[in-house]
């Protein structure tokens, strides 16, 4: 299988439309199997043990079983990075026609965070707001910050907060009047099945690539018996389409999904149009890849990374 992956490998450098996670170009590796295309795009700093889960998700997409679906389209949220001007906020939100929910990056300067939220609500007062902290606050900071945000915009406007603090113990200690979503606490766990989320989070974030694929993500969700939100990890349309299939395969899906992040890329290998706040479940056939090919030295770097990650993945399976 490794030889098949490397034989069809396409390493691409896709420019972003905004600075997202300090990324201005997103490098992704695509490869083809009997089912179509898979993606391997762990962020550059990830070690092979973590990257192997991403490779497993790509292998599942290209070579594994095709999951049955329970729905034909998926509601998605808008994603608002840490931008500060009203014009930027209006522009980015226009990429998500019909979205009813906005995930907003917070955790920096609190006043700027609140202004960002207020600017989003100025675009559409009916938006529900999701706060995304990426574990950047202490317990006391989270308590104070959420209190101030609620004072300014009202608790009824906030759907939930994602990973307000970093650790499981901090999540248990933290008591907030809004639902808490576990993201990093599950996808960064050495064993997502072994951790006890009781009293720590109310909702589980599922990301198909970091969790190793649809089958494993569904097993994690079934194990923890919590409501789930499916989100992306800034993949290309190939990886996001696999996340959409995860969302479509779940028995229940209460929340809009964070699967519209392809709009944060200036160029992508396929279009996943958002219509009335929804994306259709579809197979992606990437095109125009020659336009985005990475430099030869980057291709060699990704080939070696795949070899290292495949060795870890194979040992686990």
Predicted ranges, named:
Residues 38-40, 91-107:
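Catalytic domains of carbohydrate-active enzymes, especially glycoside hydrolases
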Residues 104-242, 247, 266-274:
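Catalytic core of soluble alpha/beta enzymes
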Residues 14-21, 73-87, 105-108, 135-138, ...:
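Active-site mouth loops of central-metabolism enzymes
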Residues 27, 37, 66-84, 116:
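N-terminal small/glycine-rich loop or linker at the start of catalytic domains
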Residues 46-56:
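A short, polar/charged loop-to-alpha-helix boundary motif
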Residues 1-28, 37-42, 50, 61-64, ...:
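Flexible C-terminal active-site loop/helix
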Residues 42-47, 81-83:
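Glycine-rich phosphate/pyrophosphate-binding beta-alpha loops
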């Amino acid at each position: 299988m490794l030889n098949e992956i490397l034989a069809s490998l396409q390493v691409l450098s896709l420019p972003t439309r905004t600075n997202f996670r300090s990324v201005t170009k997103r490098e992704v590796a695509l490869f083809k199997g009997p089912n179509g295309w898979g993606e391997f795009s762990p962020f550059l700093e990830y070690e092979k043990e973590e990257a192997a889960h991403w490779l497993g998700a790509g292998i599942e997409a290209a070579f594994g079983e095709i999951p049955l679906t329970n729905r034909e389209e998926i509601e998605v949220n808008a994603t608002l990075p840490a931008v500060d001007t009203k014009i930027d906020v209006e522009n980015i939100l226009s990429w998500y026609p019909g979205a009813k929910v906005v995930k907003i990056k917070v955790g920096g300067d609190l006043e700027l965070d609140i202004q960002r939220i207020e600017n989003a609500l100025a675009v559409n007062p009916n938006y529900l707001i999701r706060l995304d902290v990426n574990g950047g606050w202490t317990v006391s900071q989270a308590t104070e910050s959420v209190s101030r945000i609620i004072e300014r915009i009202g608790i009824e406007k906030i759907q939930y907060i994602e990973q307000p603090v970093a650790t499981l113990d901090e999540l248990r200690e933290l008591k907030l009047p809004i639902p808490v979503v576990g993201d990093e606490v599950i996808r960064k766990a050495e064993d997502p099945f072994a951790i006890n989320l009781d009293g720590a989070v109310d909702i589980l974030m599922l990301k198909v690539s970091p969790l190793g694929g649809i089958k494993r993500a569904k097993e994690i969700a079934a194990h923890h018996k919590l409501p789930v939100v499916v989100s992306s990890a800034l993949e290309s349309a190939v990886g996001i389409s696999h996340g959409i299939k995860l969302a479509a395969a779940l028995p229940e899906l209460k929340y809009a999904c964070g699967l519209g992040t392809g709009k944060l890329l200036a160029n992508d290998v396929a279009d996943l149009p958002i219509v009335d706040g929804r994306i259709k479940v579809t197979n992606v056939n990437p095109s125009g890849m020659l336009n985005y090919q990475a430099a030869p030295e980057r291709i060699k770097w990704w080939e070696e990374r795949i070899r290292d990650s495949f060795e870890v993945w194979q040992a686990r399976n």
